[in-house]
Swiss-Prot record:
PANTHER family: AEROBIC C4-DICARBOXYLATE TRANSPORT PROTEIN, PROTON/GLUTAMATE-ASPARTATE SYMPORTER. The keyword Transit peptide does not apply. The gene is dctA. Keywords: Cell inner membrane, Cell membrane, Membrane, Symport, Transmembrane, Transmembrane helix, Transport. NCBIfam families: PRK01663.1. This is C4-dicarboxylate transport protein. The keyword Repressor does not apply. It comes from Rhodopseudomonas palustris (strain BisB5). The chain crosses the membrane at residues 24-44, 62-82, 105-125, 163-183, 201-221, 237-257, 322-342, 370-390.
Amino acid sequence: MSTMTDIGASGALHRTRSKPWYKVLYVQVLIAIVLGVLLGWVSPHLATNPWIKALGDGFVKLIKMVIAPIIFCTVVSGIAHIQDARKVGRVGVKALLYFEVVSSFALILGLIVGNLVPVGHGLAAKPDAGAVAKYVDQASHMSSVDFFLNIIPESVVGAFAKGDILQVLLFAILFGFALMALGERGHRLRDVIDDTAHAVFGVIAIVMKAAPVGAFGAMAFTIGKYGPAALGNLIGLVALFYATAALFVFVVLGLIAKFVGFNIFRFVGYIKDELLIVLGTSSSESALPQLMEKLERLGCSKSVVGLVVPTGYSFNLDGTNIYMTLATLFIAQALGIELTFTEQVTILLVAMLTSKGASGVTGAGFVTLAGTLAAVNPALVPGMAIVFSIDKFMSEVRALTNITGNGVATVFVSWWEGELDHDRLQANLNRTIDPSDVETAITTG
């Protein structure tokens, strides 16, 4: 693969530079987002038309349609290509250790910022408990035992049908080990799975052409339904969350990136296409396949990418972690409830558990917030209605932070494993090798 990706790099780079700006995907998505905002602002009635909403929802469903097969193929392929079974366990342990440490930093950062900048004080909130009843009901059934049992699918077909990432991941790991145990007898099936992965990535390439349409519909509906007035006094929380997420990405993740040997700003620029897609859809899952492919091109080990990225979507949700602690403090402040130091430590410990597997729950961060509040102090639960109307605006930054965090985690674990191609890493981040050329070379190869 490295040979294919090296051939004709300079020629493709020239072609990319000469490509009209309006044909570049991230430019199209950015324009679509701006147009969506304008439509939602100028004509809320038109923007909230079900067909406008369907544009965004439809695009996200198209992406989610291939999430399960992508995860299955990449994880199985990654394990099957490893000759030493101990390596899989080693990579998994390193990834989980990294997730716990960095997730703890995210949770603590949310607590610190929420205490230093108490934007919830003085709101005199009057929450509507009924607005969040369904989320609390979902969260009330979530326990550590239920979470563990939910990882095990009742049937393989059911796991794929529901698109449950953790269940598909478990089956893929078991299948990968079984295929690896077959030795040479399993090589033909392994090659078929590799080819299937390439075909599914081809489907993704086709679907991605509709990304601007999906981003337009999602953004137009959001602005049209909620509008700038919906933020009201809550604009402080939104701004504070944005600033805290940026602080985490460029300082915490920036230090990790510097330790490994790359620049976080260049890395963010490298995955800008994926970030813009996530911004338009508010779903980090919508960019999962493209992120995995780009990380491989960046120089990360295929086996590490196949294990770390899917696992990170359930165990390394940095944006969701920041949101949970920050939103919990905000709700307490708005309701006039003073949380003691012990209660805040309890929030931290509980959130470390409830944040795991958030991607497998409808409502993601909002549902896990319900679980955290219910476990720490039930009196805080009705206050969820305070942030309910602006959760959509914060979900975008949650998703952006999550995908960036998982990207950095994959590079770090690849480096930790000694399987990071530093030359290719620097070449891609410095734009001496254009990502689109590598994609073309892999496809044609």
